[in-house]
Amino acid sequence: MTDEAITAVAGLVASFLSGLLGIGGGLVLTPFLLYLPPLVGGVAIPVKIVTGLTIVQAISGSALGTLRHRSYGNVSSRLVWLMGPPSAMAAVVGAFLSRDLADNVILIIFAILAFAGSIMLLLPVTPRDEPAEDIRADPRLAIPIALVLGFFGGVVGIGGIAFIIAALVYILRVPPRIAIGSSLGIGLFAAVAALIGKAATAQIDPPLAAIVFISALVASPIGAAVSVRTQPRALLAILSVVVMLAAIRIALTAVAGS
């Protein structure tokens, strides 16, 4: 099985989950592309190239997912514009610095973010039924969260989306469904900025990036459509499991390579 075919399959699965759960897809795409190619006769894809591909997926998947979630009234424009720009600025810095980081350091950062996000997503949440346009967030909390997660997202290529959702729900008290939709818009800012940094430091493979982009066009809107028919608590539980599994696998690889 060629790397191109593996990338296409991984891109479809990741983009579906991106639209469904608001995670940007990188949490699924990263383990797929790191471990599957050698197992099925393909060529191992370098870690830095994989992180570049997750950013491409995040841009296409997040853009389409945001539009679909917005049509359902699940995107807070106020949150997106409050947290998106600072996240983008920090993501550029993280993407440039990632060029000089060892692969296992990048994987460790990925695993820490994923573990923290998955644990937060298991915490009980107070049900809220508030329209997206009425959502308010304290800038003194929202902007620092965006800066920190944007920076680390620029390093590892996933935009810190899973942790952004957890922060929106448990720190800023945003209803889960709106947190999922808004996180895609916030992540889009960071992903575009991080792509600039990754491309400038030769961490993008154009043919594989094109495959990931096309896969997102197909699968992300389908995931978003399924999301609105799923209970918010169930979405958070599914997201937590996906994030935890990815974190465990990545952490084992990082420890073995250190």
Description of each model-found segment:
Residues 54-58, 84, 183-187, 208-209, ...:
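Short hydrophobic/aromatic, small-residue-rich stretches within specific transmembrane helices
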Residues 156, 160, 184:
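Short, contiguous, pocket-lining structural segments
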Residues 29, 160-164:
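Hydrophobic/aromatic end-of-helix segments at the C-terminal termini of transmembrane alpha-helices
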Residues 1-24, 28-49, 64-155, 170-171, ...:
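Juxtamembrane transmembrane-helix boundary motif
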